[in-house]
Amino acid sequence: MVKGVIFDFNGTLFFDNDKHVKAWGAISRLLRNKDITDEELHKHFNGVPNQKIIQYMKNNQATKEDIEYYSKLKEKYYRQFCKEDQASFHLVEGSYDYFKQLKDQKISFTIASASIKENIDFFVESFQLGKWMKVDDIIYDNGTYQNKIAMFKDAALKLNVNIKDCLIIEDSKSGIENAYQAGCRQIIVVNSANNKKEYEKMPGVIKVINDFKELL
């Protein structure tokens, strides 16, 4: 029985991958004078905290100041690109109805995101997330988390629910693997990357959806 739900955000509740790719591309050109390859994107960028991405691009030579500066700059680019594309600046279809359904069932839920605080604040304000969940319970990349596994575990603690009783909703291969390694055995995947057959074979995955209307 599901007692708590943990949502990834980017690519799960909000389809924004193109904006992240565009923003990281700008940073990559600054740091390396080259674009990001598709292989790099899947292996080193998707679902990975900013500090690890910047270390990767700086060959593990990044200082604390480098990480802070380029992380904030990347997210500034990202927010700018989101605002410029108003047509797609909304939550995935069915999201608010699913939030309501969870509320009605008295199932607590939160977000565990690799985004930094400035982005979380941006999402909370833009999508009125405070109407649905405790904003203080949202887990984000504050620089202390080693990986998404630690984020998921902390999110379960915030909900006061054993992670084995949590449903985690993810969209990336690395996110699914991290959810499973964190101890979750009920994982739903939002198929924003159009990889359904691969996701269905992964440990812990119980369902692959295109949007949240499929869970109503």
Residue spans for each PLM region:
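Asp-based, Mg2+/Mn2+-dependent phosphohydrolase catalytic module
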Residues: 1-3, 117, 122-216
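Conserved SAM-binding loop
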Residues: 13, 109, 168-169
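Short beta->alpha linker loops
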Residues: 19, 45-48, 90-94, 115, ...
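Alpha-helical elements of Rossmann-like donor-binding domains used by nucleotide-donor carbohydrate transfer enzymes
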Residues: 22-26, 52-56, 73, 97, ...
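Short phosphate-binding/catalytic loops that engage adenosine nucleotides
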Residues: 62, 107, 184-185
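Substrate-recognition element of Asp-dependent hydrolases with the DxDx(T/V) motif
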Residues: 95-125, 179
